[in-house]
Amino acid sequence: MIQLTHLSKRFGDKIAVNDLNMILEPGKVMGLIGQNGAGKTTTFRMILNFIVPTSGTITWDNRPITQKDKQKIGFLPEERGLYQKLTIEEQILYFAELHGMSRADAKSELTHWLKRLDVVGKASDKVQSLSKGNAQKVQMIASLIFKPEFIILDEPFSGLDPVNTSIMMSEIMRMRDQGAMIIFSSHDMNNVTKIS
């Protein structure tokens, strides 16, 4: 269980997050909806300890989140961060290994993931050759292949057509059904109501 208690973040006089309280439980999805500047990404960055809260606490099973816990977090940032010169396979294996998955295990799962998310192309294709939608699906695979217990998805459907949005939603629901705690942000209320 992830718990945010009285979480706030100020940047000078600007209040980005104000007294946020929430509990995320295994097998549940929580969707955050709001305009740009509403504090969604700031909340994710505080959970990940990229930025420090002004006040409040974030706990995993009633204790502070540790470095070991971070190995169990899958994160899809809003700013896509794939290395353009790497192949799809190199990219995904790199992220899987960063999260403690063996290269052999990641490699054996790769074809299955590419098929399930309907990525057009081969594992040996360079990331720079991918369409925006396929690049987003590859980044999603990199965030999920190691089977994280806690998944943070910042605007996972941004720029996707309805078919690819549906594919990504199905994958999020599959991970939820396997017991992952999932939080995501969206500008679209329909996306939030469909999977939360």
Language-model region placement:
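Conserved ABC transporter NBD signature motif
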Residues: 56-69
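Conserved ABC ATPase "signature" region
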Residues: 93, 97, 104-122
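Conserved ABC ATPase signature
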Residues: 126-130
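Catalytic Walker B motif of ABC-type/P-loop ATPase nucleotide-binding domains
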Residues: 151-154
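Helical segment within the ABC ATPase nucleotide-binding domain
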Residues: 166-178
